[in-house]
Each structure stands twice: as C-alpha cells, then as structure tokens.
Amino acid sequence: MEKIWLKQYEKGVPAEINIDEYTSLVQLFNESCKKFQTSTAYTNMGTSMSYGELDALSLKFAIYLQQLGLKPGARVAIMLPNLLQYPVALFGILRAGYIIVNTNPLYTSDELAYQMTDSGAEVLVVLANFAATVESALPKMPTVKHIVITQL
C-alpha cells in the first residue's frame, strides 16, 4: 500500500519512529517539539500551529490542570471536534500526568453523562458550541468538578 500521507511530511520528518527509543509518549512529544520547533505541527481552518507553539500552549494547559489539584492519574475528558485546541488539550493532559477520556461532541446529554460518570472524569474540556449539552448533563455528572470551555 502506498503511504500517500508521507508526501505531506516536511523535510526532515521521519517516515517511521523507533518506539524503543522512548520511554513514553510524552518523551516522544517533548523531543519532537524541540527538534521540529519551527515546523508546522497542525493546520486547521486556515490557521497553523508550530511545534514550538504547541509545546508552549500544551505546557501552559498542563500547569493549569495541575493547579486544579487533581491527583496523578485523574481523568480529563475532551469534547472537541478536530480543532487546534484538541492537540493542545491532549498533550497538556498527558504532560500533566492525567488520563485522556475522548468523548463525542455530538453526544446527547444522557450519553455524555453516562460516559463522564462511567469514566470518572473530573474535568471536561468542551467547545462553547456544545456547552448547552454539558449544562443539561451536569446534574447527572457527579464526578465532573471543572469545565474548561474553548471557542472557535
């Protein structure tokens, strides 16, 4: 099978990664951010983010999450479509030492409440467009202590 996505890789980005070189996904992420600091990491809706920007923003988000006083291994849910905020949240959660709970932004309030309760998520990161669903589900999500709302 032809790996057509490789044509999109910038010069110097390896086609394969030796996973034995890294002790964790966070280590791989940190080293990639340093190595490709000025390269584009993500592009969405006409806006690009470099690895350096992703590094800085995800670190700030990790610090914010830790300042909430969550214990190591706490669950943090992400209720976002494919936006630049998603990788910032994802890598911020990992860097803080927490567990990611991906959730569907199109869930009904009952589906969301079930997943949050079942997973034990304490934090929910959500796009403002879906805040009404969260508000409706909130009484049925006793584990959720913090909600982080982002905008388009």
What are these model-derived regions, one by one?
Residues 27, 56, 60-63, 95, ...:
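Generic recognition of well-ordered alpha-helical segments
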Residues 3-6, 27-50:
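AMP-dependent adenylate-forming
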Residues 25-26, 43-44, 76, 94, ...:
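Conserved, well-structured beta-alpha core segment at the onset of a catalytic domain
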